[in-house]
Every structure is written in structure tokens, then in C-alpha cells.
């Protein structure tokens, strides 16, 4: 049968209020902070902080990661890297200065040869060119410029 009063109400008038005579509800009965995470607080640590204890794997200190990082772009996507205005201007004056497309600024390193280029010269700057990409750019009167 449920009780009508809460425990705190029942303990009114009792000096120690259920906390004993000696310690008087003081100090740190379970240890301070994260003490006992492997022992008496084990359940809490396993449930809410899995993987808190222990080591995993080995550390390779002077490892050079991903040296083969080389994002690529194909010729058919090359004109999408420049603004619409540049495309319109290049189409209008065929004899003027060729537009420069810097693929490195757009986050690519290598130009690959898939697709066709429109018949207007263009200067492409990149770190690497595939053989077929270089042939196609030069066939429309463009130039391939290697950048560091």
C-alpha cells in the first residue's frame, strides 16, 4: 500500500535525517570525480561511457597520409568551372584572348580526356594532364599550362 507521506516529511524532527551519527552526510562516499569507474561505478561507465577505458590499436607517428591525393575533372565538365559570363564572352569573340580555366582553384589537380570541347581555344591550368586531354585541348587551339 502506498504511503501518504514522502520520506522527507517522515524524517522531520529526527536529528540525523537518515544520514547517521558519525559522517552526518558529509565528504565523498563514492570517491571524488570519476573514481571507481572500473570498480564500484562500473555499471554507470559501461552504460553511459563505453570505451572510456583501455587502448585501441597502435599509433604510427610520422606517417605520411594519402600522398596519392589527386582529384580529377573531365573535359566535358571543364566549362562548368568558369562563370556563365565568361562562357558567353568566349563564345562571342572567337578571335580575342582565350579564357583561362584554373582547375586547381576549383579543387581539382588532374584533367582527364572524357568528352568533347567546344571549338574555341582555352588555356587550362592544372598540376597534371592525361595524354588524351592534352591532345583534345590543343586540337581546339588551346594550351595546357602546368602549375606547381
Curated annotation (Swiss-Prot):
The modification Phosphoserine is found at residue 68. Residues 1-30 have a biased composition (Basic residues). It is found in: Cytoplasm. The modification (3S)-3-hydroxyhistidine is found at residue 39. GO terms for biological process: cytoplasmic translation; translation. It holds the Pfam family Ribosomal_L27A. It comes from the Eukaryota. Its main location: cytoplasm. InterPro entries: Rbsml_uL15_N, Ribosomal_uL15, Ribosomal_uL15/eL18, Ribosomal_uL15/eL18_sf, Ribosomal_uL15_CS. This is Large ribosomal subunit protein uL15. The lineage of its organism: Eukaryota, Metazoa, Chordata, Craniata, Vertebrata. The gene is RPL27A.
